[in-house]
Amino acid sequence: MSIDIKFTINDILFNQESLQKKNKYTCPICFEFIYKKQIYQCKSGHHACKECWEKSLETKKECMTCKSVVNSYNDLSRCLMVERAFDKKECCCIYSFTEQIVQGGTNCSPPDGASDQNQRKLIKDEENGCKEKIEVDQIDSHLINCQYKFVTCSFKGCEKILRMNSLESHQNECGFKLVICDFCKRDDIKKKELETHYKTCPMVPIDCSQGCSVKIERKSIIDHIENDCCNTQIPCKYFEQGCKVEMKRSELQNHLERVNHQTYMGILIDKLTNQVGHSKKTHDELLKKIEDLSLLIIKFSDACLKKQVLPKALDICSNGYRNKWIISNYSSLAKSKLNCKSLSSPILLILSHHFQVCVYPKGDENKEYISLYLRVNNIEEPNSLKVEYSFTLVNVLDKSKSITKRVDKIVFISPKEWGWGKFLLSDLINKENGWLSNDDKLTIEIYIKILNEEYEPLES
């Protein structure tokens, strides 16, 4: 972020004393240079800045110098030649200076937040300041792009103030710059804290503390010492069987070859044999428990299934099965020449019997009517099934206009279809009449009840 230095034209203008003496480029009333001021003159050629004219004309309608009558701005003329001439005067860049806060009074206004005792002082920076000479009308554009302006470092925590042209080199070395650890890849480490981070980073390779000349990541050093380091003191592998010798890991093989461990090996074999027998016994016990649990699960599942299915089956036996079949895109299906002659519902599984509802949009015999039939798929002679059923063609605009047709008793002895060939005129089935919904769906309500068997009386 750039830091602006407050300045007046007096701070940067070349030959200002000479220009002030000529009185051509200063207002004769406020005695300020005409930088960024509009200059007006009376008919006699006496000029002053716009601000001074405004204050004067509020009280007196006359020229402040010659006292000639001036009723309003219309009596004045703009001194553009004077303004343009001043715009071409040379000055230095404010960033050719450095700014210091000093004790005691100066002619300069203190910056924001500074007291009268702590005021600013501009000091020419011959070594690092801007060397460019510019014209007055170029000041603003130059200051925007000046590479010598003061800026703050963009890294959080850094309070360094420096010139723009040295910002890049500073930020490359700034201690507050966030860098990535080469080892753990953390990307939130300040550059000045990187060396400290390396001292605790779990991924930094460090020397083994036991002098084995192997470099290991800090996080793995304990595992290395306990399991891999050749200089770690370890007991003989038959320690528990009686060999109490300890040695470096690198000496273990030599120890095993040099010392006869046959007795210890026998003890170990006996121990392992006992462990194998115990493990086999445990394994057999676990298998038996698994088998018992499996039987319990099957028994429990059957009980749950009966608990869920039985009430539903009893309800269907008593009250019958009810559902809806909603046929989407009915108009398209009815008009399509590629589709089959009839439409079949999904299978209805009712007490182990497979039912289907069949719709003939163009009729099975008479094309002027829609036909509706019921079919039982899994029945063959000599078996039979007595059924009571009904179909309701739902009118979505007026439920009272819905059409219901019912069969109180029919005996199925084969997968033959039973129902109505002339249920409703096909031309009536449209959205306007309410038989189709706005999204072209036909709804059929289904009721099916399997009737109880009738038995002949017993005689003896």
From Swiss-Prot:
* A Pfam family it matches: MATH_2
Zinc finger RING-type: from-to: 27-67
Which species does this protein come from? Dictyostelium discoideum
- Please quote what the entry notes about the protein's domains: The MATH/TRAF domain binds to receptor cytoplasmic domains.
Q: Where in the cell is it found?
A: Cytoplasm
On the tree of life, the source organism's domain of life is Eukaryota
List the SMART domains.
MATH (SM00061)
Q: Which GO terms describe its molecular function?
A: zinc ion binding
From the broadest rank down, the organism's phylogenetic lineage runs: Eukaryota, Amoebozoa, Evosea, Eumycetozoa, Dictyostelia
Domain MATH per the UniProt entry, residue ranges: 320-448
| Protein name (record) | TNF receptor-associated factor family protein DDB_G0290883
